[in-house]
Amino acid sequence: MFLEKINQKTGEREWVVAEEDYDMAQELARSRFGDMILDFDRNDKFLAGLKTTIAEKKHENTDGKVHVLDIGTGTGLLSLMAAREGADKVTALEVFKPMGDCARHITSNSPWSDKITVISERSTDVSQIGGSRADIIVAEVFDTELIGEGALRTFKEALERLAKPGCRVVPSTGNVYIVPVESHLLKMFNDIPRLNGEKDEEPLGRCSGTAAVFDVQLSEMKTHEFRELSEPIVAFKFDFEHEEKIIFDESFVREAVAHSSGTIDALLMWWDIDMDRNGTTFIDMGPKWKNKNNYAWRDHWMQAVYYLPEKKKVEMNQTFEIVCNHDEFSLWFSNVGKDKSRSYCVCGLHSMLSRQTVYHVNEMFENQKFKDEVDKLSKGLHVATVGEGSFLGLLAAKTAKRVTIIDGNERFRDIFFKYIHYYKLTNVEIIEKVTSLTDSPDIVLAEPFYMSAMNPWNHLRFLYDVEVLKMMHGDELRVEPHMGVLKAIPEKFEDLQNIASDVGTVNGFDLSFFDEISTKARTATDAIVDEQSLWEYAGIVKGDAVEILRFPIDGRVSSQKCVVNIDNMSSSNAIPMWMEWEFGGINLSTGLLSISSAGVPEWNKGYKQGVYFPITALRNDKSLCLHALFDKSTGDINFQFGKSEDS
């Protein structure tokens, strides 16, 4: 079996051969299904929908028998619900084999084992289900965009091939809502970075960006960070119960009235689903500030942000229109009178960078403290900058005598050439490799930033570039940052820990076998450290930041290890980790920026942070012992957590 892995020394993607006994359960553990299973609002609403429709069908069918088809059964939870609510036969489909095996074990050890059959196939590949068609289809095949996991085809083909006439579907219908907003914050995740911050700058020409969804926990956006310009607009209405009404490609012009003047910088999106068509049982994805009475946190579905191809100004009380489009798998929105087809990036920036990285570059261009330090370090000097996709060299050009940008990514070099031409930066050159820098620079600068990095410490690739440069140009070559520090802090999240929590008994069903295989997989490997945008998740820090490893940027890369205790864990449920860099006279943090008097952390929105969730055996300890090993040969950091002697 082959697995893709990123070489942390070079940034290259490599294929490695897994051991013959590689356990796919490890993939199951890393997939973090726990949050979905522990979504009690979801579970209760599906249960209510099943209860209603099973009762209706039992009354309606002459023999009083009901066959339920569960598509994408996961642990088998919805199948168990259907059987307990009186379904006479349940056929459960699950294409992901480790999950299907898990469901088969759980259902076969339940009181309803004689009613439930688990089939490890995709619903669109199945031609018959146990000799009789379904009276009810239940499926949780949704994502942030509602239809992104193929819900439309799943329901349409199942109704056509696997269901009886009049088959009920749980859920029955769905609505998608959009709200146009003005927001400087959300602009930063999409706007092409402008070196001087002027609105009329177009260093990469005009580009509408990409129509791709930007999924985000909108509940953690502060209300002062955006301004709603109208009431929510119903963009789409989906009927999942009637195959003839399920259409893959549609376009609608929706009207709204502006309740204040402003510019539509972004569209906020969420959806709801009616579980039984009775209009009383909904799963509502509205964010917390819009849905105070019915809000339920979840991470397996989120809200989303979309951007119009062109920003649109509206005046108070003006009626305006937005074109709402969808195909089989995705949604997009466009301006009236313009091409309604999906917009694509033509500048190269949006197609290469994540929304988070676009924000990072825009934030860097706005960070006056950082720009002042770059100006001071660069003044009158030959500056070399290293990284992959780092815009630092463009900032250094303001005061430097000469700037050499070293970037191995050809597409980024093309983008930088466009910036150089647009801003007439005659003192900037670009080369591909650190070994091509033949003239000794006065100083080497880096953020450090490498686009291929998955977490903050993957930017330690910078150490290897500096090692080569110092071998070529001497140990006296000045480098900033001159120190990197890996840090950690205990935190109690309100909800994020659910993605790694044990599920145990859910709605009266024993799902502990899922915990057994997940825990076994997690403990058999290095500690699983997730990458998360922590600004999207509410929590309170419960102690001081702890230094784990220090990395002097002196040109000598060496393996190192440490053992450190993380205290106050009995009141915490996670350990966030991040890198800080000592850059000249300032500190650059990829993670924690500040802590309020109430203990609320502010996290850097331009990076993902690492976060470790203690396994069950460690969750009640007052202190955890962290063993961290930086391996020079691979550029990786391996983490192991265990009981502290102080616990």
From Swiss-Prot:
One of its GO terms (molecular function) is protein-arginine N-methyltransferase activity. One of its GO terms (biological process) is methylation. Disulfide bonds: none annotated. It comes from the Eukaryota. Its EC number is 2.1.1.-. Keywords: Methyltransferase, Repeat, S-adenosyl-L-methionine, Transferase. The keyword S-adenosyl-L-methionine applies. InterPro entries: Arg_MeTrfase, MeTrfase_PRMT7, PRMT_dom, SAM-dependent_MTases_sf. The active site is at residues 140, 149. It is an enzyme of class 2 (transferase). Residues 12-332, 337-647 form the SAM-dependent MTase PRMT-type domain. Transmembrane segments: none annotated. PANTHER family: PROTEIN ARGININE N-METHYLTRANSFERASE, PROTEIN ARGININE N-METHYLTRANSFERASE 7. Arginine methyltransferase that can both catalyze the formation of omega-N monomethylarginine (MMA) and symmetrical dimethylarginine (sDMA). Belongs to the class I-like SAM-binding methyltransferase superfamily. Protein arginine N-methyltransferase family. PRMT7 subfamily. This is Protein arginine N-methyltransferase 7. It comes from Caenorhabditis elegans.
